[in-house]
Regions:
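Surface-exposed molecular-recognition determinants
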Residues: 1-256
Length: 256
């Protein structure tokens, strides 16, 4: 059988205690790449804060309960992105293991959301702040030439939109801000354009290849990605979230 692995380097094995928040966390940080892994123990109380160690405000925060079973919220991967943050009282959340549209769930990051250069806040949801439960968070910040997240509007056309990232992507995650699945593309399974092979995160299905009618198709370019079909998974008449990482970080790339 064939397997697929995506890997990010945080602190290279070193960790440190972080007391910036009301909950003391253990962090492994790669500040150059804008990435930290944050381990903490939940309190079950809304309003708690956790230090993430990045030194800049994270644009993506993924949190998972490591202790509880599926029925107690242990199966949910909460997903925050700064492009969906409207105000401290209106912070939309998605879940990596679900297809649901973003929702303003105050149980995740609290009724008055704080996400800044030192901490992120928590509500009382068991999946992100279960009492005495072991939690893990992955924090990413946009870094010029390496990591870019945001949104775009599809045009439902075979000559689809071009999304500028400032680098040639190696890895790309897309989700429509409707009830739709997460699609992940990378430069290892499709080493040349067109890009058609993708995984869908909320399903246990095998790899999708040119799935749909019309099929899912896009190009990785020197400075972003270009849609080549009108498939609703990534280019219908909707707004889409994306997260991309560079093939050659902080260097000039060429088209392929």
């Amino acid at each position: 059988e064939s397997y697929l692995s995506w890997n990010w380097l945080a602190g290279g094995g070193s960790t440190s205690s972080n007391s910036d928040g009301s909950i003391t966390s253990t962090v492994s940080v790669n500040s150059t790449a804008g990435f930290s892994i944050v381990s903490y123990t939940g309190t079950g109380s809304a309003g708690a804060t956790v230090g993430h160690g990045l030194g800049v405000t994270p644009d993506v925060i993924i949190i998972k309960n490591r202790t509880d079973s599926q029925s107690d919220g242990g199966s949910y991967w909460s997903f925050y992105n700064s492009s969906m943050f409207n105000s401290a009282a209106d912070c939309n959340i998605m879940y990596l293991n679900e297809t649901n549209a973003p929702s303003d769930d105050t149980n995740i990051h609290g009724t008055s959301v704080t996400i800044n250069s030192t901490v992120f806040s928590l509500g009382d949801y068991n999946g992100t702040n279960g009492s005495s439960d072991n939690m893990i968070a992955y924090c990413f910040s946009n870094v010029e030439g390496y990591c870019k997240s945001g949104t775009y509007v599809g045009n439902n056309n075979s000559n689809g939109p071009y999304i500028y990232t400032g680098f040639k992507p190696a890895w790309l995650l897309i989700k429509g801000l409707i009830n739709d699945d997460w699609a992940v593309f990378d430069n290892k399974r499709d080493s040349y354009n067109l890009m058609t092979r993708h995984m869908r995160l909320s399903t246990s299905a095998t790899e999708y290849v040119a799935a749909g009618s019309p099929p899912v198709e896009l190009d990785f370019t020197a400075n972003g990605f270009k849609h080549r079909n009108s498939n609703g998974q990534i280019n219908g008449s909707n707004t889409y979230f994306y997260l991309a990482f560079a093939e050659a970080p902080f260097k000039y790339a060429t088209a392929r």
